[in-house]
Amino acid sequence: MAAAAARVVLLPAARRRLWGFSESLLIRGAAGRSSYFGENRLRSTQAATQVVLNVPETRVTCLESGLRVASEDSGLSTCTVGLWIDAGSRYENEKNNGTAHFLEHMAFKGTKKRSQLDLELEIENMGAHLNAYTSREQTVYYAKAFSKDLPRAVEILADIIQNSTLGEAEIERERGVILREMQEVETNLQEVVFDYLHATAYQNTALGRTILGPTENIKSISRKDLVDYITTHYKGPRIVLAAAGGVSHDELLDLAKFHFGDSLCTHKGEIPALPPCKFTGSEIRVRDDKMPLAHLAIAVEAVGWAHPDTICLMVANTLIGNWDRSFGGGMNLSSKLAQLTCHGNLCHSFQSFNTSYTDTGLWGLYMVCEPSTVADMLHVVQKEWMRLCTSVTESEVARARNLLKTNMLLQLDGSTPICEDIGRQMLCYNRRIPIPELEARIDAVNAETIREVCTKYIYNRSPAIAAVGPIEQLPDFKQICSNMCWLRD
């Protein structure tokens, strides 16, 4: 139940489209060929188009309370159903930071109808799995079960978020569990670096706070804090009941009306708007020469989920790619940065990232280096960023587009990832974006678009930097900023 970022999901029918072309391109590409092989290709294209059209529809219904019910029926014998709530650590303040994550821990500790033991036995006897996670903007509770047990799964989820007892004894017990979890997180240097990155990039704002909250808050959060958070944020318009697998939308809708129809209240007036989180180019350095490797993240401000430039930044992120010493390929890797890194033995690993929130985001790279190669690796990274702004080629962009589409489809394999994709997209876009539409938007990105968008968000922009470990060789912040617009070899 550790804090996690929201994931994406898809389904078996989509796996048949790993080539990644849109319908229109497939049909247009086959048209005009009159040879025997051309006719065969045309028949194959028509069959492939039917596969695309047979992808199950995502049905969406909004109840009077504002609760959105969304589902995709793929006829499987299992299903995943969950509640996606527009409430995470960003909705907290300094005093109650950590409450959303604390609530996630309390979800399975008993309700007015079920003790913790009863809840665990019921889930086990169903052969189901019950889980939850918290991110900076969302809280999720979901269950994976047999399709025939969908009614019981929905009833249990409704019971958990509406009738949790939040007993004092359980609160004290979970307080200790969360403190131990915090100790585990502090040993994961990647999580530590990303928390530092948010803290410096969004300093003095809600996104700058951690999901778990500070130790003093964990020790002081009370039952009243938990109840107040539920009362304030668990409102109908901010909740999505999503399901995928062997689910009937009509049945799910009836279950939603029965279990949530009259109990979820709405906001008086408009849903409260999130205060903006201002990005600040800055740095955090935690030097520890006893550590064997330096861990560093550098990022510029990106855009929110619904921004038109999001897709282009996703392609740019794929262009940079990721690399680890365990990878093969060497100079034959598709990522130019991976080639340079491998050839120069500059780092142990690097991973590009594009983290989006409602109205802002972070686009950057995380790397793990030897102390002596930190400066050289950062220099190569920034040089590659500048190349995206000036001279990226069409062949590179085409390869990145195909890789992005493939990865996108591979992540949507099974009812759980599909359900997560539905829930997340309903909160972010208030709709499920069809795969052909998403592929068409990716295919619209070319080298010129990459250069324009990267110049807009990367060139001459002040980055946020978080570095931990033996970082004596890391250039000063002024030098790093100057390399965002001009580099001397």
UniProtKB/Swiss-Prot annotation:
Functional description taken from the UniProt entry: Catalytic subunit of the essential mitochondrial processing protease (MPP), which cleaves the mitochondrial sequence off newly imported precursors proteins. Preferentially, cleaves after an arginine at position P2. Required for PINK1 turnover by coupling PINK1 mitochondrial import and cleavage, which results in subsequent PINK1 proteolysis.
Activity regulation behaviour: Binding to PMPCA is required for catalytic activity.
Gene encoding the protein: PMPCB
EC number of the protein: 3.4.24.64
Site (Required for the specific determination of the substrate cleavage site): E191, D195
Keyword Protease among record annotations: yes
Gene3D superfamilies registered for this protein in UniProt: Metalloenzyme, LuxS/M16 peptidase-like
Cofactor note: Binds 1 zinc ion per subunit.
Cellular component aspect of the GO annotation: mitochondrial matrix
Transit peptide: 1-45
Name of the protein: Mitochondrial-processing peptidase subunit beta
Upper classification of the organism: Eukaryota, Metazoa, Chordata, Craniata, Vertebrata
Keyword Cytoplasm: no
Keywords associated with the record: Hydrolase, Metal-binding, Metalloprotease, Mitochondrion, Protease, Transit peptide, Zinc
Cofactor(s) listed: Zn(2+)
Domain of life according to the entry: Eukaryota
